[in-house]
Amino acid sequence: MIVTLMNLLRACWRPSSNQHARAGSDVAGRQDGLLWYKDTGQHVNGEFSMAVVQANNLLEDQCQIESGPLSFLDSGPYGTFVGVYDGHGGPETACYINDHLFHHLKRFASEQNSISADVLKKAYEATEDGFFSVVTKQWPVKPQIAAVGSCCLVGVICGGILYVANVGDSRVVLGRHVKATGEVLAVQLSAEHNVSIESVRKELQSMHPEDRHIVVLKHNVWRVKGLIQVCRSIGDAYLKRSEFNREPLYAKFRLREPFHKPILSSEPSISVQPLQPHDQFLIFASDGLWEHLTNQEAVDIVHSSPRNGSARRLIKAALQEAAKKREMRYSDLKKIDRGVRRHFHDDITVIVVFLDSSLVSRASTYRGPSVSLRGGGVNLRSNTLAPYASQM
């Protein structure tokens, strides 16, 4: 069982690319201290940019972009898959999602010979079930894995359609060109499940009318049972199955009263919409970015700057805001090491997906460039990474 857990953690720190990294190239991304980035790359529907900055002692954010086949069939469908997994309590759940969710999506897409909301829902269910199997196996030797979970944001572009699925509070924002004014408008596409939002609190309260303490205001922050801000996630077994909410789990995670139905849900909010020629780019990011930038600020930064390095540019803007809030210089914030850095900002993951309308409108049988890439942290093997190109 220990071997299973070590393999799971080791997978978090292994970069993935279907191309071989060449010395001095940035195929697998570049590392600059706590920042990992891939400034530009090609996907089936255009270009992309990725960046991850680490704040926790162990990076809890994971992410991936997969471009090309979305099933195991030669006939397709083909497209682009984007995943942002913001872990909490540890890296294990986010790592597990990174290793399994896309595989499950391809399996169900093969069965249905298409991408659909149902395929996404089944992929989430299979990922949740798989991680619960890990928790069950690890419980006797590592019971605290029951208190590890992850938000999970996924976007799939296939045949001119954008599918978005989400649990938790990561966010995808569309940059849409408004012809009449020349502006690029920010349009949020994902529903969030954070109980700081009044409508989310009310929904949870309506689902648990017998529990007056289903949401608690603690240190001026709303939390589910006083423990966690999100009400939907992958993992977090201790708030979904009562058999994992007992000793030897740490007392701070154990509820005083037993519960008879899951408190948290793993069911994703899913939206499906056709992409339009005036839809220019998508910004997928963990909540670490949105704590410091508004949707429109992020869209304006991407729109007003070169595509190359756009994800890294967004992270820099967020860190500058984080430094300003603490009345310190950005240059001094960058000197703070992981672990201590978490007092100033969260792990931040950003993937900017640019949309080429001539490519987006092609049928789902169009193969395009094949890419498989995962974001990383300081735990990546250094020999797979090129040295950084410039100061952030």
Curated annotation (Swiss-Prot):
Enzyme class: hydrolase
Binding site for Mn(2+) 1: 86-87
GO cellular component: membrane
Keywords: Hydrolase, Magnesium, Manganese, Membrane, Metal-binding, Protein phosphatase, Transmembrane, Transmembrane helix
Residues reported to bind Mn(2+) 2: 86, 287, 346
GO biological process, one term: regulation of intracellular signal transduction
Co-factor remark: Binds 2 magnesium or manganese ions per subunit.
Catalytic activity, reaction form: O-phospho-L-seryl-[protein] + H2O = L-seryl-[protein] + phosphate; O-phospho-L-threonyl-[protein] + H2O = L-threonyl-[protein] + phosphate
Subcellular location(s) per record: Membrane
Sample GO molecular function, one term: protein serine/threonine phosphatase activity
Entry EC number(s): 3.1.3.16
Endoplasmic reticulum is among the record's keywords: no
Cofactor: Mg(2+); Mn(2+)
Domain annotation PPM-type phosphatase: ranges: 47-355
Annotated Pfam families: PP2C
Presence of the UniProt keyword Zinc in the record: no
The family this protein is said to belong to: Belongs to the PP2C family.
Name used for this protein in its record: Probable protein phosphatase 2C 60
Source organism (scientific name): Oryza sativa subsp. japonica
